């Protein structure tokens, strides 16, 4: 689609302007109908753009998804495929960074008696993840809607499926203006 191509071109420009073209060059190829079947499963990708919707509110639910050697780490298993990388001279540094990140996440996971210390340890792991470019945050989606439902009356859960419950919604058959929702 044209939207997908436009988005890819914008991202290529952002990468070029931010990181330069020496080490990161976005090569835009043809559109595919199934990223999983045509790109991720045959391991033809260099990176991916996707999101994660947490099942529960602990940082482990997010940060555990890119840990090394963990079969339940979705991103590691399905997207980065880091668990399949064979250690060579060329890959040793990358694998060591993933192992260090995993050790930081495991250390945070082990803290169960002090929530502040647990979150501080997860913050350290997250900072390592981003600083070492194991994951690079690149976009955030905000959905705009024309609605007859007051969004302030809806459940606003940060994770799980609670946001889908139609309970105690306030509605207006004429819709809402920006002023009414301010």
What is the role of each PLM region?
Residues 6, 57, 146-149:
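Short, solvent-exposed loop/turn elements at domain surfaces
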């Amino acid at each position: 689609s044209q939207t997908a191509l436009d988005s890819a071109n914008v991202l290529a420009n952002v990468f070029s302007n931010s990181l330069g073209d020496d080490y990161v060059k976005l090569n835009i190829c043809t559109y595919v109908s199934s990223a999983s079947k045509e790109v991720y499963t045959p391991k033809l990708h260099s990176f991916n753009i996707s999101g994660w919707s947490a099942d529960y509110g602990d940082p482990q639910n997010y940060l555990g998804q890119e840990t090394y050697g963990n079969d339940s780490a979705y991103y590691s298993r399905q997207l980065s495929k880091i668990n399949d990388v064979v250690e060579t001279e060329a890959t040793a540094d990358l694998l060591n960074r993933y192992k260090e990140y995993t050790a930081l996440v495991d250390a945070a996971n082990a803290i169960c008696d002090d929530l502040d210390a647990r979150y501080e340890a997860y913050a350290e792991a997250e900072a390592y993840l981003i600083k070492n470019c194991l994951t690079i945050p690149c976009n955030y989606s905000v959905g705009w809607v024309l609605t007859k439902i007051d969004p302030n009356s809806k459940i606003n859960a940060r994770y799980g499926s609670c946001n889908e419950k139609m309970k105690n919604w306030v509605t207006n058959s004429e819709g809402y203006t920006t002023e009414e929702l301010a």
